Structures are given as C-alpha cells and as structure tokens.
Amino acid sequence: MGYLLLPMEGKTTPATHSYASRAILFAWALCLFSLPRQLAADPLTSRALIDQPAGSNEPFGLVMEKVATGPLVEKWLQIQREIDDERLTLKICEQSRASCPRTSLQFFSIIQNGRKLEGRARFGEINRSVNLRIRPMSDKANFGEDDFWSSPLTTFARGAGDCEDYAIAKFAALQEAGVSSDDLRIIILRDTIRQTHHAALAARLQGRWLMLDNRRMIMIEDRQVRGYQPIFLLHRRGISLFIGDLRISSSALKPSFHVRGGE
C-alpha cells in the first residue's frame, strides 16, 4: 500500500485521472530526493510497518516529548502567524468574491466546498483539491532556497510547492472549513525505504487518524501506513518529537536540531 498510486474516489474523466496520476507520481518522486543532512548522518532504526502501543491518542500511538525551542519551532510559529494573518484575506473573499484575489479565491473555493460536506467526505474533498491545485516543486526551484515553508496563500499564488506546503495548506483549509485544530497534525516522517523525509497531514475523525498525503488521493489510517517512521508532530500548541520505541541520537533532542521536510 505504501507506494501504490491509488485511484481517486468518485467519478473522473480519463483526462483528469491521467493528469492526477502524473501529478501525484511527480510529487512522489520529488520528495524522494531531499534527505536532510542532519538526519542522514544519524539514521533512525525503523520498521516498514509502524506499531501502535496503547495509551496514546496521537497519530501512530507513540509516546512524544515536547520540543520547546529551536529553528523548527520558530519556523512553525511563523507559519501559524501567517495563517492567522491570511484569515483577513479569506474574510474579504467571503464578503465579496469580486474583491478577492484570483489565487486567494481558488483557496477559498476549496474551503467553501469543504464546508458543504462533513466527516470523511470533507477531508477527502480538501485532500484531493489541494493535491490537484498545487504543482510539486522543490523549494530551490520555487524560492531559490533549500528550505522554505510557504503559507497557504503564497503557495496558491505560486501554484507550486513541496510536501510540507501541501500539508500546511490542508491544515489551514480544514480549520477554515470547520475542523478543530485539536484534530489536525502535520507529521514529519522518514521514508524508511528510500531513506528520505516527507511531510503529510493527519486529521482525526471519530478517534481515528487519517493521513492526507500529496502522494495519494485516497486517505488511509495511520495504522495502515507502511514504509514511513514518524519523527515530529506539529500542532497548534507547538511541536512534539515522537519517542516511543524509536532510537534517536542525543543530537536530535538538542534545541538547535533542525529538520527540513522533503519536497
């Protein structure tokens, strides 16, 4: 299941399906070629299938430790501030579509479509729409930087982004569509087969965590994930490091530790 490109739920035309498949394949390939040097020097010991010990309500059921400071925390706080600032633009779009910038209107339309649905259908609509609207592109090609986290409206204005940009856009869209931030997590994971890193959104529905990934249209539960090992969890209250049964070097726990998500 880990690397199969699954078809979209619902009806699609052959042209739409072909485009979507090519886009996902390209996004999947792009993410494989960005291994953070900080982690590459000290890889994690991991399994293909993630176990879920009892006693945790977070994705993957693993124990976590809060990360208080460091570049990753600063980067996430900055993105949250930008998401909050962009709510003003979305409010303008809600009051007058004619006054809404075109690319902002695209993002707002995804939110509106999500609001019309509930539960899994809402998650699926936003997952598919964001996956199709954003072209996969590395930070280097898009911004001229090795690591740049883009706010949702910036990503939509560019029409392109890497895996954490997809996850950030879905995080913001689901919040605006009515999903509590308590039920949303951005997960930074290690691809244990390709030895690279990736980011995806986890959304909780009726006590179960669904993975919204730019590599696939179909959402799967965290317990079904294969080929990934979770490392960091980003949520409204901050960042946590998955510890559980993982063996991570002491350098990973230092405040200055920095992870760059894959493209």
Give residue spans per PLM region.
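A structural boundary/capping signal
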Residues: G2-E9, P14, R37-E263
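Bacterial N-terminal signal peptides
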Residues: A23-S34
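Acidic, Ala/Val/Gly-enriched low-complexity intrinsically disordered segments
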Residues: A15, A20-A23
